[in-house]
């Protein structure tokens, strides 16, 4: 046995080994193992990447949700705090008002206590409504209405308004809608002569305006209360600022309605307002502003008109000085007429009478719509109003246009300097009655003669007219509450009526 060199033996062993091992299978197994490892690594790394992406997205979403919830919680907390503060403040106000009942009450005649006027009775709706700047809003609305409209807009806009509020365009004196430069001119439009026939008869009272009858009746001669709606009244003394007794203790044809100390004191007592110079300074002062004679020369009546009114008023006149006797068998009646936005906005004289005094009571401009009249106590006493006082053949007669929201102006044809709801300082002093007379219009009659059907003035948009007049007990109304009337239509008659 020969010994093989080491080098040759190693070479031979390598050859034998390579011959016995399947080289292809070995390489394949190595490739499969490597591929499996790669795929495993890829699968693992992809899943991890997806998980990482998902986890990062969830973190972002959770952060956004947390921020949104935090914002909602902050907003909710703000509303909770605001609501709680409002409730607490309102409770304090209500409690303080209830606790001050004795302070609000004043001692009247016969030991009877009366309470001051309140604009709400534990009603949040009217309380919030009463805090709105309605006078400023009405002035702004008046400025908007006075803006000149493009000619092409006018027919479309006015027809739309007429459709919404039931305006009868066929009655217009000037049917060309392009001639009305703005809404104010369209609101204050004139109607054709003869469109509103006036009820004739010396004992007939005609409607002073278009509108809806809200209330008619008799004024309580003991308390002087006027029924605003069923179960809700206001005082004629607070409404007109007249003497203590509703019938004024003497016929209106001889009433001296000009300013005098006794009347001022009575008016201050009725309205629970202290006169200047009094020792008690807790109550607001009453200032009577006498504006003198405001007669307009252009409206000076003719001789025939004076004679006609003298003949109508002769029942209460005799001898020189035009003194008169006490009225007998008479009562005070009232009628309330609401003018809707679509109505004819001018008001006319309902009877032959003499307007002697104009009293302007600046006030608020709450809405006088029927809903507010049913639910808002003392609405007419709180609102701005112009009381026109005088006399007719049966005694006292008054006609009072009452302002309302978005009614920026009450116009009087025979008092052109008179302006209501003005931003100027002319009529802005609180607790002040601005009074004027019309003696120079007729020296004989002592006031402005007005015949039935004569135009006196008007509103811009719509409002309310209140009539308070003295008449024989035989007077009967010819209309019912809720009836719609036209200017000149018969409201009532002394004697028989046609109401069934």
Curated annotation (Swiss-Prot):
From the record, give the cysteines joined by S-S bonds.
none
Q: Where is the transit peptide?
A: 1-48
Catalytic residue list: 210 (charge relay system), 348 (charge relay system), 463 (charge relay system), 463 (schiff-base intermediate with substrate)
* Gene Ontology CC entries for this record: endoplasmic reticulum membrane; lipid droplet; mitochondrial inner membrane; mitochondrion
Protein's GO biological process: lipid droplet formation; mitochondrial electron transport, ubiquinol to cytochrome c; phosphatidylcholine biosynthetic process; phosphatidylethanolamine biosynthetic process; positive regulation of mitochondrial fusion; positive regulation of protein processing; protein autoprocessing
What changing residue 488 to P does, per the record, is:
Loss of autocatalytic processing and leads to protein degradation. Complete loss of activity. Growth on the fermentable carbon source galactose is severely decreased
Record region (Enables targeting to the endoplasmic reticulum in addition to mitochondria): 57-101
| Region of interest called Required for processing and stability, as start-end residue ranges on this chain | 475-492
**What follows loss of this gene?**
The cellular level of phosphatidylethanolamine is decreased, and phosphatidylcholine levels are increased. Decreases induction of mitophagy in nitrogen starvation following growth on a respiratory carbon source; recruitment of ATG8 to mitochondria is impaired. Growth on non-fermentable carbon sources is severely decreased (lactate, ethanol and glycerol). Growth on the fermentable carbon source galactose is severely decreased. Increases RNA level of genes involved in transport, generation of precursor metabolites and energy, carbohydrate metabolism, and stress responses.
> What induces it, per record?
Repressed by inositol.
Name the pathway it acts in.
Phospholipid metabolism; phosphatidylethanolamine biosynthesis; phosphatidylethanolamine from CDP-diacylglycerol: step 2/2
* Subcellular location(s) per record: Lipid droplet; Endoplasmic reticulum membrane
- For the modification Pyruvic acid (Ser), which residues carry it? 463
Description of post-translational modifications? Glycosylated at Asn-34 in the endoplasmic reticulum.
Enumerate the Mitochondrial matrix topological stretches.
45-79
Q: Which chemical reaction does it catalyze?
A: a 1,2-diacyl-sn-glycero-3-phospho-L-serine + H(+) = a 1,2-diacyl-sn-glycero-3-phosphoethanolamine + CO2
Cofactors that this protein relies on? pyruvate
Give the note describing cofactor binding and stoichiometry: Binds 1 pyruvoyl group covalently per subunit.
Q: Where are the transmembrane segments?
A: 80-98
- Annotated InterPro entries: PS_Dcarbxylase, PSD-B, PSD_type1_euk
What Pfam family is a match, any one? PS_Dcarbxylase
Q: Record's HAMAP family?
A: PS_decarb_PSD_B_type1_euk
Family to which the UniProt record says this protein belongs: Belongs to the phosphatidylserine decarboxylase family. PSD-B subfamily. Eukaryotic type I sub-subfamily.
Q: What else is known?
A: Present with 1080 molecules/cell in log phase SD medium.
State its role. Catalyzes the formation of phosphatidylethanolamine (PtdEtn) from phosphatidylserine (PtdSer). Plays a central role in phospholipid metabolism and in the interorganelle trafficking of phosphatidylserine. Phosphatidylethanolamine formed in the mitochondria is exported to other membranes to fullfill their requirements for PtdEtn. Required for normal mitochondrial morphology and proper mitochondrial fusion during yeast mating. Involved in lipid droplet biogenesis at the endoplasmic reticulum membrane. Required for induction of mitophagy during nitrogen starvation.
- The name of this protein is Phosphatidylserine decarboxylase proenzyme 1, mitochondrial
Q: Which organism is it from?
A: Saccharomyces cerevisiae (strain ATCC 204508 / S288c) (Baker's yeast)
**Name of the gene this protein is made from:** PSD1
């Amino acid at each position: 046995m020969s010994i093989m060199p080491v080098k040759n033996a190693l070479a031979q062993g390598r050859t034998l080994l390579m011959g016995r091992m399947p080289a292809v299978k070995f390489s394949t197994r190595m490739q499969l193992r490597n591929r499996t490892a790669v795929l495993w690594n890829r699968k693992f790394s992809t899943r991890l990447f997806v998980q990482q992406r998902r986890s990062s997205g969830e973190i972002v979403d959770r952060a956004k949700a947390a921020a949104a919830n935090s914002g909602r919680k902050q907003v909710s907390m703000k509303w909770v705090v605001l609501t709680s503060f409002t409730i607490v403040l309102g409770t304090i106000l209500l409690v303080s008002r209830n606790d001050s009942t004795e302070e609000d009450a004043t001692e009247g005649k016969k030991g009877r206590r009366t309470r001051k006027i309140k604009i709400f009775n534990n009603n949040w709706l009217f309380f919030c409504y009463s805090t709105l700047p309605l006078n400023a809003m009405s002035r702004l609305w008046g400025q908007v209405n006075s803006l000149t409209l493009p000619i092409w807009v006018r027919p479309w806009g006015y027809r739309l308004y007429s459709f919404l509020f039931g305006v009868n365009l066929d009655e217009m004196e000037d049917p060309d809608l392009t001639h009305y430069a703005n809404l104010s001119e369209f609101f204050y439009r004139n109607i054709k002569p003869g469109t509103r026939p006036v009820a004739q008869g010396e004992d007939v009272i005609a409607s002073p305006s278009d509108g809806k009858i809200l209330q008619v009746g008799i004024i309580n001669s003991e308390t002087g209360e006027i029924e605003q709606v069923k179960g809700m009244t206001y005082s004629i003394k607070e409404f007109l600022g007249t003497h203590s007794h509703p019938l004024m203790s003497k016929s209106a044809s001889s009433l001296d309605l000009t300013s005098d100390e006794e009347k001022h004191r009575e008016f201050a007592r009725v309205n629970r307002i202290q006169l200047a110079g009094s020792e008690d300074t807790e109550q607001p002062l009453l200032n009577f502003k006498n504006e003198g004679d405001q007669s307009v020369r252009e409206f000076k009546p003719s001789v025939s008109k004076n004679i006609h009114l003298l003949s109508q008023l002769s029942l209460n006149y005799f001898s020189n000085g035009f003194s008169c006797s006490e009225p007998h068998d008479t009562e005070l009646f009232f009628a309330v007429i609401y003018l809707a936005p679509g109505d004819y906005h001018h008001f006319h004289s309902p009877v032959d009478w003499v307007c002697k005094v104009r009293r302007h009571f600046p006030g608020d401009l709450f809405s006088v719509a029927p809903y507010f009249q049913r639910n808002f106590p003392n609405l007419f006493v709180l609102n701005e109003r112009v009381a026109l006082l005088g006399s007719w053949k049966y005694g006292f007669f008054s006609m009072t246009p009452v302002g309302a929201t978005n009614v920026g102006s009450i116009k009087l044809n025979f008092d052109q300097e008179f302006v209501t709801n003005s931003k100027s300082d002319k009529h802005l002093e609180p607790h002040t009655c601005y009074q004027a007379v019309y003696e120079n219009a007729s020296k004989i009659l002592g006031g402005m003669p007005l015949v039935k059907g004569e135009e006196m003035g008007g509103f811009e948009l719509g409002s309310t007219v209140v009539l308070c007049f003295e008449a024989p007990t035989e007077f009967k109304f010819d209309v019912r509450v809720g009836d719609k009337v036209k200017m000149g239509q018969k409201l009532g008659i002394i004697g028989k009526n046609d109401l069934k």
